């Protein structure tokens, strides 16, 4: 009996000891000693291979190696000239290959390729998602920032800090990271208090998931409703981290920098131009009749401008009767009504009367119009009145809509109060005069004592004023980007079961204990909270930040990561296949100044990367998926590399970088009715990373190749092989048109000889000469059905679609 008790006690002690030991990913990184006789990466891989009695494969031939590394680092195939130069280089392969790698890493194409991997992780898109899926017109600035940062080899610790606290570090565009995901913003679903609170919790949850899974490989979001079931993350940790971002808001913000300074310098000249035009108009005002009546529902659109309040001044009505309104709405670039009383907007007005005392004044901004049951707000005095709405937080407005109580003409002005306190006019009565593109004849515009020519001149003058005001508003607002903006942080509450209506206790901002010892002062200013988190995560000894990043890079080079679950390094994730290598890479990455390009160079110059991909029967029996890396694992290219490759091979690739993207669909936002475009001009022949990214909408053709729709994080893309992929490429108007361009290029460069044409087609598309059987088959196909069909089939071949 005593022996049994002793045994049970020992089991308890052992179990307790195991339970107390931190999970592998939370333990300090260990630096292994590496033999100087081989490449450091090969040193770790060969040890695992020996355990299974396996060996490396032979090195790939130079042509295969060049195509592999070129597609891997730039996403584009090498040109025949580049293949010839590398194949004929008399230097040792190590030396010649290193020069190739440095050339590719220095190419602007490198940042375009690897930015897509990062955007997948954080599910970046240019629409909101959820029920509205409205457009984020200025979100492309963040995409361009990522591309530029990767091309400049911005150290990863700086890359991370800029994205968490770019307003402090001077990288405004980087703040697009925090609001990259979908957002169900307050007021979009429901306007009652519970719906508003839930929406706010949801949008902050998206931020926490982006940061925790994208940067740290931890599912902190699982602790929103209760303590994490598997990892040492408490519910208090979740809300403490939420408090770090409690001042964050989604929307447009002003982009500081040279462009902003340039725009600001142009404002005085534009103001003078506008003043001169208005003086010219005033001299003719007496000739104008009273403006046409307002429609019962009227809208004014203008250049996006960030505002904290809006006011409408009604100077006169047609018959001197009192002005009246049923509803007043201020619409943001995200499709949200910022004037909603339920969203915290506060209306005020000059003295007024109610047509029926049962209608509250705040009904003006309740987002609902029902003339059968509602009664309008009516100014107490005829002729003039004003209405003002102060927003709960600054909003980027693009249009104003109001529902007039009666269709009487009005003389009005609408102004917004910018964050700096200045008022800016965005709409006024003259906006309702005919534009210079009005389809009506000049004789139909009723102006007193004016000929048709004089009327048209006046209409053109008013149109010029309107255009100039739009230009002035745009300059005064400054360049806009879609990125996180910040206000005084909301109070953060610990919520019972995550229910926003069941508040338990106030919580101060805090870094979760699982991430290591760090403190944020309870009263820390909003930006200092985020900066403290960023500095903590980029400490050289942090156990997660570097591990997670090097694993992502490894995965995108070999198809699989050292950890199979790149965004979950917790207990529900997988253990690393080569833990010593993972730690060594992470520490070396930090030692090399967090340089991503040095990390790429280290990986692709290793022997395991340069192996042939040919299968070996004995090795396949032991490790069919080549997880131990006894050969280079072949894989299908991603959708972007396939489309970009087609354009490159056809000679139509437009290498213009940056700016607003081209469209795959007939519209840029909305929940439904997306129609894929069938033809593209030169702008649509840019690299696919520059396509306008619509959330929740698969891209025509290339969606079949597992191109994610940004509805969810995609730390690792699916690599399916289906008949739909081949059918899509064979029947796609885009692919067929590029095949025709491809054939035309081949004819121009190879002449009329069939053999020479097929040879060049293979060298362009596959970076190699065709095998005799391939030459014969494609030549026969070209003779019977035309060179276009041979090129079309080549686009569908494994030699083109796969990285070998």
Residue spans of the language-model regions?
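Globin-like tetrapyrrole-binding proteins
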Residues: 790
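Sequence context surrounding c-type heme c attachment/ligation sites in exported
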Residues: 170-268, 702, 714
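Extracellular beta-strand elements of beta-rich domains used
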Residues: 328-330, 400, 414
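N-terminal pre-domain segments of enzymes
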Residues: 19-37, 482
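Short, surface-exposed beta-strand/strand-loop-strand elements in extracellular ectodomains
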Residues: 408-420
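Disordered, acidic Ser/Thr/Pro-rich linker "stalks" and the adjacent N-terminal cap
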Residues: 267-308, 317-395, 405-408, 422, ...
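Bacterial N-terminal signal peptides
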Residues: 5-16
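Primarily short, surface-exposed interaction patches in extracytoplasmic proteins
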Residues: 37-67, 72, 77-109, 125-162, ...
């Amino acid at each position: 009996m005593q022996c049994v008790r002793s045994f049970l006690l020992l089991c308890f002690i052992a179990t307790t000891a195991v339970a107390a030991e931190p999970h592998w990913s939370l333990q300090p990184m260990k630096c292994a000693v590496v033999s100087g006789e081989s490449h450091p990466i090969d040193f770790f891989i060969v040890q695992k291979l020996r355990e299974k009695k396996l060996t490396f494969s032979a090195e790939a031939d130079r042509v295969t190696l060049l195509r592999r590394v070129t597609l891997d680092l730039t996403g584009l195939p090498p040109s025949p000239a580049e293949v010839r130069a590398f194949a004929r280089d008399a230097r040792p392969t190590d030396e010649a290959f290193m020069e190739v790698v440095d050339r590719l890493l220095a190419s602007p194409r490198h940042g375009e390729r690897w930015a897509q991997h990062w955007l997948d992780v954080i599910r970046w898109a240019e629409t909101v998602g959820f029920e509205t899926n409205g457009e984020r017109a200025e979100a492309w600035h963040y995409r361009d920032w990522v591309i530029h940062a990767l091309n400049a080899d911005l150290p990863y610790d700086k890359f991370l800090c800029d994205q968490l606290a770019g307003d402090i570090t001077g990288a405004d565009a980087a703040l697009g990271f925090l609001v990259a995901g979908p957002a169900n913003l307050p007021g979009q679903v429901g306007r009652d208090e519970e719906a508003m609170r839930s929406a706010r919790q949801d949008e902050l949850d998206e931020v926490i998931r982006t940061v925790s899974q994208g940067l740290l490989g931890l599912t902190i979001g699982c602790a929103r409703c209760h303590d994490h079931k598997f990892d040492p993350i408490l519910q208090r940790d979740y809300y403490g981290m939420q408090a770090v971002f409690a001042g964050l808001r989604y929307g447009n913000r002003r982009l500081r920098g040279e462009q902003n300074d340039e725009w600001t310098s142009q404002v005085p000249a534009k103001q003078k131009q506008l003043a001169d035009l208005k003086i010219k108009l005033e001299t003719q005002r007496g000739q104008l009749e009273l403006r046409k009546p307002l429609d019962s529902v009227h809208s004014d659109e203008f250049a996006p401008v960030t505002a904290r309040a809006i006011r409408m001044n009604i100077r006169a009505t047609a018959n001197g009767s009192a002005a009246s309104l049923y509803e007043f709405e201020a619409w943001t670039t995200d499709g949200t009504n910022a004037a909603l009383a339920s969203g915290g907007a506060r209306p005020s007005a000059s003295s007024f009367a109610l047509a029926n005392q049962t209608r509250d004044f705040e009904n003006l901004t309740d987002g609902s119009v029902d003339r059968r049951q509602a009664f309008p707000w009516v100014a107490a005095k005829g002729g003039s009145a004003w209405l003002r709405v102060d927003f709960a937080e600054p909003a980027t407005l693009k249009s104003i809509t109001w529902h007039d109580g009666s269709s009487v003409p009005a003389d009005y002005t609408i102004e917004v109060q910018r964050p700096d306190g200045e008022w800016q006019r965005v709409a006024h009565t003259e906006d309702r005069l005919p534009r210079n593109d009005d389809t009506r004849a000049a004789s139909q515009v009723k102006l007193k004592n004016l000929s048709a020519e004089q009327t048209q001149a006046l209409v053109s003058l008013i149109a010029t004023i309107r255009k100039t005001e739009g230009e002035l508003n745009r300059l005064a607002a400054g360049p806009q980007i879609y990125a996180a903006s910040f206000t005084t942080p909301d109070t953060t509450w610990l919520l019972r079961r995550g229910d926003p209506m069941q508040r338990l206790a106030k919580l101060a901002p805090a870094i979760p204990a699982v991430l290591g010892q760090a403190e944020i002062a309870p009263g820390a200013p909003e930006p200092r909270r985020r900066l403290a988190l960023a500095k903590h995560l980029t400490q050289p000894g942090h156990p997660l930040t570097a591990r997670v990043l090097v694993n992502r890079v490894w995965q995108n080079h070999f198809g699989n990561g050292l950890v199979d679950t790149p965004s979950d390094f917790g207990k529900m994730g997988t253990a690393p296949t080569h833990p010593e290598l993972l730690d060594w890479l992470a520490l070396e990455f930090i030692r090399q100044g967090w340089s991503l390009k040095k990390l790429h160079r280290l990986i692709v110059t290793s022997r395991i990367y340069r192996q042939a991909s040919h299968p070996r029967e004995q090795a396949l029996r032991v490790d069919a998926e080549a997880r131990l890396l006894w050969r280079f694992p072949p894989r299908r290219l991603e959708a972007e590399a396939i489309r970009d490759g087609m354009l490159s091979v056809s000679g139509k690739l437009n290498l213009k970088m940056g700016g607003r993207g081209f469209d795959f669909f007939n519209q840029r936002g909305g929940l439904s009715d997306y129609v894929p475009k069938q033809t593209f001009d030169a702008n649509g022949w840019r690299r696919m990373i520059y396509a306008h990214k619509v959330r929740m909408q698969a891209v025509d053709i290339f969606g079949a190749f597992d191109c994610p729709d940004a509805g969810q994080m995609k730390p690792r893309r699916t690599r399916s092989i289906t008949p739909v992929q081949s059918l899509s490429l064979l029947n796609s108007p885009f692919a067929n048109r590029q095949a025709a361009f491809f054939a035309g290029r081949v004819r121009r460069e190879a002449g009329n000889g069939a053999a020479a044409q097929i040879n060049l087609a293979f060298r362009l598309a596959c970076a190699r000469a065709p095998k005799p059987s391939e030459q014969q088959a494609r030549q026969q196909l070209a003779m019977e059905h035309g060179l276009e069909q041979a090129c079309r089939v080549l686009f569908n071949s494994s030699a083109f679609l796969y990285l070998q």
